[in-house]
Amino acid sequence: DKDYLSTRIAYKLNLTGPALTIQTACSSSLVAVHMACESLRSGECSMAIAGGIGITFPQTGGYLYQKGMIFSPDGICRPFDAEANGTFAGNGFGIVVLRRLEDALVDGNTIIAVLR
């Protein structure tokens, strides 16, 4: 069940603290990162894992274009392209591990990016 995915992952990885499943349609991943950053800023936690996942299971349906909807007429997604004409749903995930910069520097963690 999608509502328990974050809790099951936290349990399997022996993580402590809140495990939240956030559902805000297209903004879920960004809201998860925002909430993780707020928890870090407030001192509620010293590390957070945030991200998003989109999986359609089982794959039983095909692609159906309907004029006036958000899906691309040719089934191709062209983000940031002048020829962009809609989106296409697919499976994927993205996860980030977040820490306060000063803590990551002290511990010698590899830093890929800094959120401000």
Each language-model region and where it sits:
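Condensing-enzyme catalytic core of the thiolase-fold
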Residues: 1-116
